[in-house]
Regions:
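Conserved beta/loop motifs at nucleotide-recognition and modification sites
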Residues: 1-187
Length: 187
């Protein structure tokens, strides 16, 4: 049976967006008491203690580690093993999200156990063709349109950085006021 365990790994923008979508999909009340986000890897005992806490006036609590080095080769193996051993006992009322902005080490016990019990989403580093598609998707989200040539020009100028591309598309969408974004707007 799948548990409430999520691993988001790889390209940082996609990891952050996936985490944000997960958080938005949960029915969390009193968020300040039922959401704990560690910016870096806490000691295993602290993470386990946080996960074991009962949600307060909410059906679920969210515990997340933004830079889960325990999933990488650089992480502490003993700490990772403690967490891996705990995953099977994770309460049904706790959602655990382990995020890392690089490729995880699939040989790690923690990765294997999380993949077995939960959901793993890996996001490879973007390629230029993927970035052009990303620009088109972002324009659509902003209520704008952009042609393939203009999208390619934007990728050529900005580079294949999802954060920078999303920011530039948002600015262009405001600038164009709903009309199609053209190469002239970008230059």
């Amino acid at each position: 049976m799948k548990r409430n365990i999520y691993v988001f790994a790889g390209e940082s923008y996609m990891v952050r967006e996936s985490f944000a979508r997960l958080k938005a999909s949960l029915d969390i009340q009193m968020e300040e008491l039922n959401v704990t986000v560690f910016s870096e890897m806490p000691p295993a005992d602290q993470l386990i203690e946080t996960c074991a806490a009962v949600p307060f006036l909410s059906p679920v609590r969210l515990v997340a580690v933004r830079d889960c080095t325990a999933l990488t080769a650089a992480g502490d193996k003993d700490e990772a093993k403690k967490i891996a051993d705990y995953l099977e006992r994770l309460p049904d009322t706790t959602v655990l999200a382990l995020c890392v902005a690089e490729a995880p080490d699939k040989r790690r016990t923690l990765y294997k156990r999380a993949a077995e019990l939960g959901t793993v989403r890996e996001f490879p580093e973007p390629n230029p063709a993927g970035c052009v598609s990303f620009v088109a998707e972002q324009a659509k989200k902003q209520g704008a349109r952009i042609g393939r040539v203009a999208a390619q020009l934007l990728v050529d100028l900005v580079g294949c950085d999802y954060y920078a591309l999303a920011n530039e598309v948002a600015k262009l969408a405001v600038y164009t006021g709903g009309r199609e974004i053209t190469a002239e707007d970008i230059n």
